[in-house]
Amino acid sequence: MKRGKLWGRLVSAAGLSLSIFLSSIGNVSTAYAMESNDALVLDETKENTESATDASSNEASDAEADNDTDEAITDASSKELSAENDGASESDSSFDEYDHTALPETDEITVTAAGELSTAKAELYTLAPREAREADNSLVTRDSIHDGAILHAFCWSFNTIADNMADIADAGYTAVQTSPINECLSTNPGMNLHGPDGMWYYHYQPTDWVIGNYQLGSRDEFKHMCDVADEYGVAVIVDILPNHTTPSTGSIAKALMEAAGGSDALYHATGKIGGGYTDRLELTYYSMGGLPDVDTENTGFQQYFYEFLKDCVYLGADGFRIDTAKHISLPDDPVPSDYSDAGRNTFYPNMREALNEYSEEVGTKSYDELFVYGEVLQGTNDRLAAYQQYIGGTTASNYGSSLRSALSSGNLSVNRLLDYQIYDDTAYGSTYTADTEKLVTWVESHDNYMNDSESCWKSIDDDMVIMGWSIIAARDAGTPLFFSRPNNSSAENPYGDNLIGAAGSPIYKAPEVKAVNLFREKMGEADEYLSNPGGNIQTLMIERYNDTVQGAVIVNAAQTRTTISTETHLSDGIYPDQVEGSNSVFLVKDGVLSGSVEGEGVVVLSEKMDGTGKVVSFYNNKNWNGVVARVDNAEETLDTIDENDGWFQVTVLDDEFTIRFESADGKEVSPEFQITAESGTFATPDSSELYYSKAEAEEGLGIHTYPVYFFNTENWGSVYTYGWLDGGAQLFGGWPGTVAVNEGSGWYRADVKTTGEITAFNLIFNNGNGIQTVNVEGITPDSKDIYLAVDAEKSNGQLIVNRYEDKESAEKALGVSGSYTTAYFYNTEGWDKVCAYTWGATALGDWPGKELTQDEDGWYSVVLPAGPSEDLNIIFNNGNNGKQTNDMKISDMKYRFILNNGISYQKYGSKKDAMEAIAGAGDVTYETVYFYNEKADDANWKNVYLYVFGGTDGEYNNLVGTWPGKLMEKEEDSNG
């Protein structure tokens, strides 16, 4: 047997398994597991097998960390394909560094004018109906979609959508978006989302532009779905993708090929050459992610494709989402020298004209009556504002990224979430103005969920999705789109039932989601005001108001209930929470809103009742087993809300009344309190006296509170505080103590409450599971250095802490906070320069990013203006000279120290740990990998690449280079 061979580096001393992929760029073989010291002979290939790796795709990913390659040649859940790349011009860029041959020059194609069909070609087309069409439901308009909410029924079949239309409408959605409805690749017609038969991406690989595919249903079923939607007043938006076809060109419909003038004419002259993501010419005329780039400027193709769009609207489509829209040229974009017509970039203007002409002909909606938006993932040269003008709307990928980052960190600061992060476009002398009203916003897209697990299901659970949705749907600008996650999905089982065609998770109709959708519809064009009540960045309030409507949505990202007492634009009155099943009531009196929101909860206020009331608080310092309230000696008691600090509150809808508090078992009873318009509302069990604040009440009981703060850079899931006095008396009971209060941005607060005078106390912070700080002793009532942070460089075993006088000093010393992150790199390979490139939560400019200077200790550091999150991405590189780390996420406050440990680039929790990894690195051994290429005669398998990944912590990822890996050497006299 003749074999091609490649010398690959492995570390046998590590004793860890790895996996490899063999590919030919457009095709991927089976993944093989390989143990250390094993020789390996491979003699089989298989197309379109997914990768199990979560290794990075290339040297730079899109600013949103989701990508345009959801429809790529292999299961996009693996990241072997090129992501949206703000800096992909370097030599080791995915697809760019390999030897590609452009398509041969083709003869000039004789085509008719846009919108006309020659007699000779008419038979090639599946023509849309030309009979006059009855009008749709008059309630379904572009405005009803724009001012409402869209459900993205990802991978739901047409019949499934129709069967669930009543629920969709009842949940307050004004539109439903389908997955692509065109004929698609079906060489391996699996019906799973993920796994060996996971073929969700097939419907992003068109083989023809006619309605119907094996995954979603037939043309008749599509029409039935549209008819049902019309009955319920729900619009239908179709996901379309004119930019590319499947790379399996043998599956392309003959009619499509002939309409374009032949197989070569269907694609751009450079349409099978991998392009970058920063140059407009490469963005629009080159292949993206291994998918051949359609010549969307070919008028024969345009006519064929526009007939597909006409058929869609004739059957009932009310709008379109254009996949990979920024990969199709705008009229003022450059044209390659391969073409003589400098004005050929006409796809979008001609699309508008064709749909308008069809509207006049048969009575369908005109272009401006349709809701059309394009997927324009933000990055260098995205030209978002210009696409808004030519298409009508665009996505808001950067805002989605910031929102997910905020949710995963629990930091809902207005400063972080107010700006939609879109900008005017002046690329070619004209000014296009970015418009927030033309945005489609999301918490996550299907690209995020299926391709970028780190920023979605690994870090954003269903409750966070609902909170994020409540934010974007409550806001004034844009149109929110709710991505339907797979049914029964979770972080442990992200694909849930793993079925194409089935309905997704029911969270799309959760009570909070429905309430916010109806709130959005009611608020219309009302003004918005965002605030963090009481300065609490874990709570966000979105107020909407004008002369005719008013309301507010409050989102609490903390895990515990939070009490609200804040100034508001709402008029005085009583506001019941509109979330179904909630009994919460909020009061507004003298312009102050009062109430409470449960942990990770959402409150929707849009209905005002006349009247007034009082919130009365009771301090349970006797540790009763539950607290209830009895008002005016009523037979029934009222439940109270535990504020998790010893206080319980109850809302009474009256200004004057008597109230007493009782233990849940009725054995303990407080004095009776007389509440008046002028009285205080804070009570204790020790007397009938009323106070005007918690602090005043606790002082009246002789209670002194001494807060101490802990900076949780260790990423503990919970922080416990154990305390004792010098005499041995415990402050919070036995070990591990009490749960500290999460204040957000990594800070936790422990309140030491004592009666009488004390001279000092002592604390230990711990995670409740065996990891703890050293004893923090000698804290006095007058101590100012009450802000504690772990010193990772000095710790060994128990964690040593340093004490600071404020949060800012601690954050500066550690180089991290909720709003900035310092990332560190040690240059073990002797690069002549070190640059940092970032995307997602923040950007440092185009590739290769910002050049760094060496610190005194030999490390390089860069301060990033964003807190750690799953969307804070960084690549250290040597300035576009072929060397770089893989994609690294700075997702927490600890693991920010990066170096090559002799095997791969890894993150460490301190400089000390990183340097110890170098000192303990073992010797490198080498193994030879052999592969027998049974498809050597296939042009797509002319070259074979080896990609390596694996290891417990991914240390073997990119071992021989980023995807597609290293070109294997063909042995002489072999068939390869």
From Swiss-Prot:
InterPro entries: Alpha_amylase, CBM26, Glyco_hydro_13_cat_dom, Glyco_hydro_b, Glycoside_hydrolase_SF, Ig-like_fold
Cofactor note: Binds 1 Ca(2+) ion per subunit.
Pfam family, one: Alpha-amylase
Cofactor(s), names only, from the UniProt record: Ca(2+)
Binding site for Ca(2+): N243, T284, D293, H327
Active site: D323 (nucleophile), E375 (proton donor)
CDD domains reported in the protein's UniProt record: AmyAc_bac1_AmyA
Sequence ranges of Acidic residues compositional bias: 61-73, 87-96
Site (Transition state stabilizer): D447
Biological processes per GO annotation: carbohydrate metabolic process
Signal peptide stretch: 1-33
Protein name: Alpha-amylase
